[in-house]
Amino acid sequence: MAKIIGVANQKGGVGKTTTAVNLASALGVLEKRILLIDADPQANASSGLGVEEINFSTYHLLEHSAEARKCILPTTSPNVDIIPSHIDLVAAEIELVDRENREYMMREALKSVKDDYDYIIIDCAPSLGLITINALTAADSVIIPIQCEYFALEGLGKLLNTIKNVQKIHNPDLDIEGLLLTMYDSRLRLSNQVVEEVNSHFPEMVFETIISRNVRLSEAPSFGESILSYDAESKGAIQYIQLAEEVLLRNEKLIKN
């Protein structure tokens, strides 16, 4: 049965979608069966994996209770399928408000495909609205990307409070998989200060893997490819493989315990 991991941060530009796409692809390269769910109306994860024409999307999954299997498409990355997003997903925030059990729509929809995959990765919307609450209610854990730049911790308290509320009301089993430092530049004092600050504030919650600023990483989505397909020898590809290995190791330890 798949472990479901949300990738969330309501602050834009922190490497959220980059992480969702490339962690999914790295796990696929490591021969895990992966379903990526694009739950961001901007649909950058979908276009970043070469998805262009779609009939069903996350919107249909949530708003019209479409069967999950109907919404799944193959991607350019080995062992990675996707439920793509569409701008229509914006409307779901409003349309679901009066629905009974509205926070549980994604959890219910994914039950039918959990046995088909090893991991389900959800690229959450850059907000703390109903779609993100759905993702966190469906998830077993959440990865929070944090950029190594000014105001790195801005908004993190709000996200952690949202996670606590979801744990309290909807999903008591939700864990924080880890905080992931992104856009790191070893030449900059600020980057190194952020690494120290995050590690001191959140000991034992931070991934050892740090994602560096990397030109190839930012180029890959415009070609509809993950960094693993676009340039497997780049620093970005190597670091996302390391992150995937770290996630697998953490989960193997959890299973043993």
Please report, for each region that a protein language model flagged, where it lies by residue.
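P-loop NTP-binding core
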Residues: 1-257
